[in-house]
Amino acid sequence: MSIQLLHKKLIKRKLTISVAESCTGGLLAHNFTKLANSSKYFQMGLTTYSNQAKIKILKVNKNIIKKFGAVSHECCKAMVQNLSKISKSKINVSITGIAGPGGGSKAVSYTHLTLPTKQPV
């Protein structure tokens, strides 16, 4: 689904969205907010690039990062769960991954995206 189509659906269905980003560095929030009338649905965009930002801003338990890594399903899930506590949006999205050029033990572009919602968009 394109960002333009999602934009139209969010407005039509009067849904709100917030995002917590890491590897994308705010690009997801930018893609939503560059469209006219995005204020009707876009509530919050947090860029938590460092582990410290994930811990301090999104309250990700440091043991999750230590055990599973910042680029893991567990970390991404904690990011979105804690985002939902502060944003109150109907839809919350988190993304974490390896942006490159080097990825350490994980491949460049290895990414986790979490979008829990009770209703289809």
Give the location of each predicted region.
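Short alpha-helical segments enriched in small residues
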Residues: 1-113
